[in-house]
Amino acid sequence: MYSFIRNCLFKLDAEVSHELSLDWLGAFERLHMLKPFALKVTPSPINVMGIDFPNRVGLAAGLDKNGDFVNALGQLGFGFVEIGTITPLAQSGNPKPRLFRLPEHQAIINRMGFNNKGVDHLVAQVQKRRYPGVLGINIGKNKITPEENALDDYVKCMDKVYAHADYITVNISSPNTPGLRNLQFGETLANLIAGIKQAQDRLAQTHDKYVPVAVKIAPDMTAEEIHSVADTLVNGNIDGVIATNTTISREAVQGHINADEAGGLSGLPVRDKSTEVIATLSAHLQGAMPIIGVGGIVEGADAQAKIAAGASLVQIYSGFIYKGPKLIAEAADAIASAG
């Protein structure tokens, strides 16, 4: 059934079909019609960052930016759902068109630019949620905020979402917000992490609960840069690292009609690069921090490969678009069967 729906949606503009599919998903949930789409997912409970996850397969940020579809997505079998990226103020993002499919490569290029309705809208939606599972909230900075003031935006978001999140992800790796990836390096990263940790400590006291913070990094780094980022995160007592975001490389899709579109490339072409980053992180961290692996999972074996490389959890997004909810069960089964 999903293949038929996907083929119909793929005849439309990519962003139109994205919005339409979410609207349908929400409608099906309200009408209690999601069961045919949700397969039985093999339980593989694990505790990561102090949180109990029912299985290791989560939804990556970006699909539900505003928290409008948490209840529906939560019924599909995910072990956790991450929403966002959200910013303090609503923003429209980059001009359209800004989302492109590469079906031959099971890939997507996006230059959305953190389009979202603002953190207050997301919090209002999350407060109404019926989904009882693990919820991550991914936060970013507004485009109009100068790079040197980025910490202010992250703290504003943390202040608003802390009470409602099971974990918070700090997104410093999207290629679609000018200067954002500069936050990943050197003293800039160290100062940002120190400020985020200070905010986390303050909020933990205020709310009498500890909400872990993970940092999402880019795949386009050398081994030395990955080591440096990892050391900064460990020294800053960050709770986890998500590897990776989209890539700006086009090596794997050269010749495709959309290959030269600006933005981040996700899906199958980023699979191996993401897994290599996970392996590099794992070898360097030696268990000092859990890794959440994301990037290019289009079948169960891809998810298991990321676990084997050192990830404790995995997330899917582009593969979910191409394969549908069955990928959740396939990934969870592959991980569980590998032990």
Swiss-Prot record:
Cited function: Catalyzes the conversion of dihydroorotate to orotate with quinone as electron acceptor.
GO cellular component, one term: plasma membrane
UniProt cross-references to HAMAP family, sorted A to Z: DHO_dh_type2
Organismal lineage: Bacteria, Pseudomonadati, Pseudomonadota, Gammaproteobacteria, Cellvibrionales
Residues annotated as catalytic: S174
GO biological process per UniProt: 'de novo' pyrimidine nucleobase biosynthetic process; 'de novo' UMP biosynthetic process
Organism: Saccharophagus degradans (strain 2-40 / ATCC 43961 / DSM 17024)
Subcellular location, principal: membrane
Family statement: Belongs to the dihydroorotate dehydrogenase family. Type 2 subfamily.
Name used for this protein in its record: Dihydroorotate dehydrogenase (quinone)
Alphabetized SUPFAM superfamilies for the sequence: FMN-linked oxidoreductases (SSF51395)
EC number: 1.3.5.2
Annotated TM spans: none
Pathway: Pyrimidine metabolism; UMP biosynthesis via de novo pathway; orotate from (S)-dihydroorotate (quinone route): step 1/1
Keywords from the UniProt entry: Cell membrane, Flavoprotein, FMN, Membrane, Oxidoreductase, Pyrimidine biosynthesis
Gene name per UniProt: pyrD
Note on cofactor: Binds 1 FMN per subunit.
Pfam families reported in the protein's UniProt record: DHO_dh (PF01180)
UniProt keyword Membrane, yes or no: yes
Catalytic reaction list: (S)-dihydroorotate + a quinone = orotate + a quinol
Residues reported in the UniProt entry to bind substrate: K65, N110, R111, M112, G113, F114, N171, N176, N245, T246
A GO MF label: dihydroorotate dehydrogenase (quinone) activity
